[in-house]
């Protein structure tokens, strides 16, 4: 907040995410799916990017200057990062909708407090929003998760991050009512204020909240029947956050590779869904559906090149003679994050094939073994990785 005019401040950002009942969340309609304070999640950072392709008109025009442009497809992308925040008991993490969106399996659906992968094409979609200081609100509808990563290094706090795309984007600013309304559906704003609102904006005025803009014409917004007086502030709706959990520290936990505990310097694992957005259909402004492609689960372990740890790298490749075909090692990996019982996050990769990377040897300091891996599923599929919460 500035001295005379409100500013959006990162420290006041509120982030919300909710699994959609139907893909796209009924965007821009009177039944658009709503958010609430219970959908809040704490994030370290977030990004929402909206672009619309504008192509220069390229036919003959008698001048070297560009005089006209043509509208192309819209594209929406997003990312966010959070601490790992287990809350204990059977409470799902606040970021649960995004984990389920990445993995497909719900919290505790098969095994209590454990996320598992799903081979379904119908990965859940998420309605996501962030608000700041009554200055602006951004909403994304039909969010899919392309990547989810869990990482830890040194003594830093372990983190979870997500990225993906979405069907639709809405930016909501502020305005002021022009005139009064009684059980009216056309909310007139002061001249020039209309640009601060889009179809799908969720606004508050006259002690009313969650009013959805279903259409807009210059400075007139179409909303559900409402009443208001003149010169009232119109602001983006926000909610009082309800969140749970405390960050895991980076000094408690362990990693075992093939039953050997390693004092790792870094660890990460990433689920990539191979999502194909269906954005190439004619007569569509952007993406209205997607197909989940081949999934990969890959990661990396870094550990100092101590004499007794060389075998952790060497076991990736075994050759019995100079001409014999090699065999490749598949080993289990378990990562325990946190040390307080009931508030740990445990990552299980039951079958990991160790991949290849160079040993990092600096000029004077200790060498580092980099051990990349690819998680493999059994013949049934869908069991490359499990993530257990509140252990």
What are these regions, as identified by a protein language model?
Residues 1-391:
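Signature of extracytoplasmic/envelope-associated structural regions
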